[in-house]
């Protein structure tokens, strides 16, 4: 999987449909480099770092989580630097830690999810780590000539959904916020979707980056969401 360039300061490792690995992005400021999400596993993080190094990019010293789901967070223990998440994300991850410590949780996930089974083939231990820094509503980071506005949003996908907006580049990272609730039989809450649409519309972005598909122009994403 090759690293893709969005702007001179933003690149990403694309979504891998074989394992359903989400995309991982890198925002390079003059002082700090921010990663979007911590990946499915340590192997996912290593593939990301290898791709960054191969193209001469610095490795991230900050990592922000878009939500708690395991394909976005179970690689956090292998990530460099300071990790950031919404407070509810850490609460959910703490629940995951308890599940992993109290029984055969990895075997359960392998039985339920073929992508997880492939990602963790030959492994029998989970390393679930909490983020070191949490926020409640919004957190603004000065990366050096680039700003990362990290904010919680209402979303049909997960109650801890977090977006990252880079105003200088007019790019909005949405994680899986536009998707249905995977852990509630794929339920799509129309009221929450409507509020998310309003949030996207109100954000001065040109491009929207979702975790499991290619980046989309804002107008195209809004048209799709409004058709659901």
Model-derived regions, located:
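Metallo-beta-lactamase
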Residues: 33-34, 40-42, 94-222
């Amino acid at each position: 999987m090759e690293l893709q360039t969005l702007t001179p300061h933003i690149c990403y490792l694309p979504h891998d449909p074989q394992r359903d690995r989400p995309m991982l992005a890198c925002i390079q400021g003059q002082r700090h480099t921010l990663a979007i999400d911590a990946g499915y596993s340590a192997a996912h993080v290593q593939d990301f770092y290898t791709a960054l190094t191969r193209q001469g990019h610095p490795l991230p010293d900050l990592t922000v989580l878009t939500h708690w789901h395991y394909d976005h967070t179970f690689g956090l223990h292998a990530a460099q630097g300071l990790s950031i998440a919404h407070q509810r994300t850490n609460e959910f991850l703490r629940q995951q830690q308890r599940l992993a410590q109290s029984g055969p949780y990895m075997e359960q996930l392998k039985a339920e999810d073929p992508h997880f089974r492939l990602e963790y083939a030959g492994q029998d231990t989970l390393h679930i780590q909490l983020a070191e820094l949490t926020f409640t509503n919004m957190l603004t980071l000065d990366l050096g000539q680039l700003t990362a506005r990290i904010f919680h949003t209402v979303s049909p996908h997960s109650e801890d959904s977090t977006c990252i907006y880079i105003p200088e580049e007019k790019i909005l990272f949405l994680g899986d916020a536009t998707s249905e609730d995977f852990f509630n039989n794929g339920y799509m809450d129309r009221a929450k979707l409507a509020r998310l649409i309003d949030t996207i519309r109100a954000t001065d972005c040109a491009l929207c980056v979702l975790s499991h598909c290619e980046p989309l122009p804002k107008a195209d994403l809004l048209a799709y969401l409004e058709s659901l």
